[in-house]
Amino acid sequence: MQAIRAERLARTLGVSKGSFYWHFADISALQTAMLTHWEALATEQVIGATDSAGGNARVRLTFLTDTAASDRSDAYGGLATEAAIRDWARHDPAAAKILGRVDARRQDYVVGLFKEAGLAPNSATRAARLLYGALVGAEHLLQSPREQVRQDLQHLLTKLLLPD
């Protein structure tokens, strides 16, 4: 993200450099706004949509994995955006902080769904960690057909929901 320059960005968008600085104090402020926007879209809106889908916890877990592996995720930045932000966070402490907050929020939500589905707390935490790890890993399978990724995630979810 070091390559972002206000003048170049303004020119690309067809606005003045002054217009950029009217909205953002500096490039760092733009980056923070981008990450905060992504956090809201890719976390809170996804959780809201999952809860709004209704049904029991298993139905909502299925909806969540379907959303993550489908083109519906494009509305939330998509798999490529998520992978780029994770790469960015490896080199930028501010991005890493927001990504850490996103990961914690998402995992807590999924742990809650697994508990609601009847898993014991330790099993729910382990299942959530495994499912979330698979979802994050799916970001790097962009060459795989989304339907195949969706089916694989559903298979994993079925296995994780089995009683101990």
Which ranges hold each PLM region?
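Amphipathic alpha-helical packing segments from all-alpha helical-bundle domains
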Residues: T43, A75-A83, H91-G118, N122-R129
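Residues in soluble alpha-helical coiled-coils and helical-bundle/repeat scaffolds
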Residues: A25-A29, A33, D51, G55, ...
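Generic hydrophobic alpha-helical segments
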Residues: V46, I85-R86
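Helix-turn-helix
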Residues: M1-A33
